[in-house]
Amino acid sequence: MSSPLLEVKDLQVTVGEEQKVLLDGLNLTIYPGETHVLMGHNGAGKSTLMSALMGDPRYTVTRGQIIFKGQDVTHEPADVRAKLGMFLSFQTPEEIPGITLENFLRTAQNAITGKPVKVFAFRKELAQQMEALGMDESYADRYLNVGFSGGEKKKSEILQLLMLKPSLALLDETDSGLDVDAVKTVAQGVRAYHNKDNALIIITHNAKILEGLQVDYVHVLDDARIVRTGDGSLENALFCVYGNAISNSLYPVEFDNGYIRVGGYVGSESIAG
């Protein structure tokens, strides 16, 4: 068996001077080729986990370790993790005036590989990937995400994923706010990226983005930790019984004697197989 791509060990994450605990005792192991889905009610810690993995300075790791590609990156800044091959797609991508989408991608690619970018080959691949995502080539010359629609911003994120080819992609509600056609396009981009050598962690409210992907593990977060892990059939069961309720509910998810409980709703866990 190959070595783990990511190991999260007994992770505790706090925020603010009062050190409010957002994650506590969280463990997670991911191997190359795997797809993991995070589910849980609002405030369960899904986005916090993604941000902490990427090294967001707003959060402090007060216990535990984050091991990426065999290297302890627990206290490394985001740029070090990015150069090692970690990528985070934001719920709301930032606008960056003054740097075009093409220049951003070329600079990022150079920083990650440490090698000069071959301009002709780069532009050819960029044009091909933009066409596949239904993005007009003129967006390459526009400032990054400035004036982009919500859908174009999300496509820009997937374009970055395809061009930079990270080892681990953290997709935080990349499909949120998109219409049906845009979700399909984003899903196609995610499928085009994924292979046996990289891995995905996905937060989503929409099962459509998972179509065509083999979901290896589904993790339900509650009370600052992962409280349940299952295979792809658990994800199917949760979506079938509750739809978006599992992700949108303000209530905790509970597992008790073979039943899944979300707020006042109860469903049999046995439908997960």
For each feature predicted by the language model, list its residue ranges.
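Q-loop/switch helix immediately C-terminal to the Walker
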Residues: 92, 98-113, 125
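ABC ATPase C-loop
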Residues: 161-162
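A short, flexible loop at the N-terminus of ABC-type nucleotide-binding domains that lies
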Residues: 2-8, 12-25, 31, 37, ...
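The feature captures the beta-strand-to-loop junction immediately N-terminal to the Walker
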Residues: 39-41
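Conserved beta-strand-loop-alpha-helix hinge in the C-terminal portion
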Residues: 217, 225-247
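ABC ATPase NBD Q-loop/coupling interface
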Residues: 65-81, 145
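Helical segment within the ABC ATPase nucleotide-binding domain
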Residues: 183-196
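Walker B catalytic motif
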Residues: 173-174
